[in-house]
Amino acid sequence: MPEVLLVATPGTRIYVRRGVVYAEAPSGEKAVVTADTELVVLATGSVSVSGRALRRLAELGVRLVVLGQRGQVVAEHRPVDRVNRTIEARMEQYRVKATGEALYYAAEMVYAKIVNQAKLLRYLAKSRREPWLRDAGYRVEGHADRLRQIIENEEPTTPEVIRSIEAQAARDYWDAIAQIAPTPFPGRQPRGEDHLNMALSYGYAILYSIAHDALTVAGLDPYAGFLHADRSGRPSLTYDYADTYKPIAVDKPLLTAPRKTDCLDTYMGALTYNARRCIATLVLENIYKTPYPDSRGRKKTLRDHIYTYAWNLAAAIRQHKPYKPFIVGRL
């Protein structure tokens, strides 16, 4: 099973000894990059990495990503052979963008995202014994039903119609979350400076790094999106694709962790080292270690679903077929 190594202790050294890559904390505690390690995440800026370690990580096929204070990926080191060199999927991706067919792929992704939001609310209703959350979940799912009708009837649509339905669902979803949030929460604001918004943004950035790699490996262009606006340097398709997984990959662990307030500590308007370590640990363990069934009953880790469905998306685009994104099964 693929594994991830999180480096979040300031002063850690990453080096090679006898062909083995070690991450050694100032306390002397060591972690080893094993044959199963797929990803090394640096969640602190106070880390030294030797050139030999970078070379050995590449030889082992291990990606290394560096996260900023808000969780955004500020640097990435990847083996060159992880990039799919075929251009067929990308050529078809650009074609469906030009013809407008991409909107149907976008609509399916937004539909899956809304359904996953609704399922999380119903799960929270059951685990917290709060019936009103179940009602909120069905209210959110009502927006998905409207979008499903547009898709099924092949009605002419525009990005504005899809975004409008997505926004209405998001409002109902985050209004419900605000009532159970562990700290005051004004609703989802990507640049919000309250504790929960900063934690969500940090967790989403970790998810983006994994989704970005999955799309790249599948042969797609992460910067050519279907719904998010294209801008220079903006991985629009990564955002479109990752949205499907946000409720289960990030929202769920942050809202249900026994000591979730540890992930919300801030100092001078930024998440503390301990909070960043807490968020990264929760999100990465949820993605890499917790199995979830999809709507067809196939039980895998979210990491495996993310890569599998990226290949499915690339195949659907190449073969001019419909795409069914990830929808979580029974929670």
UniProtKB/Swiss-Prot annotation:
Record-level GO BP terms: defense response to virus; maintenance of CRISPR repeat elements
Keyword Heme: no
Disulphide-bonded residues: none
Superkingdom of the source species: Archaea
GO terms for MF: DNA binding; endonuclease activity; metal ion binding
Annotated Mn(2+) binding sites: 166, 228, 243
InterPro entries: Cas1, CRISPR-assoc_Cas1, CRISPR-assoc_Cas1_C, CRISPR-assoc_Cas1_N
Top-level enzyme category: hydrolase
Keywords: Antiviral defense, DNA-binding, Endonuclease, Hydrolase, Magnesium, Manganese, Metal-binding, Nuclease
Enzyme Commission (EC) number: 3.1.-.-
Cofactors: Mg(2+); Mn(2+)
UniProt KW Manganese keyword: yes
Entry similarity comment: Belongs to the CRISPR-associated endonuclease Cas1 family.
Assembly and binders: Homodimer, forms a heterotetramer with a Cas2 homodimer.
HAMAP family reported in the protein's UniProt record: Cas1 (MF_01470)
Annotated function: CRISPR (clustered regularly interspaced short palindromic repeat), is an adaptive immune system that provides protection against mobile genetic elements (viruses, transposable elements and conjugative plasmids). CRISPR clusters contain spacers, sequences complementary to antecedent mobile elements, and target invading nucleic acids. CRISPR clusters are transcribed and processed into CRISPR RNA (crRNA). Acts as a dsDNA endonuclease. Involved in the integration of spacer DNA into the CRISPR cassette.
Protein name stated in the entry: CRISPR-associated endonuclease Cas1
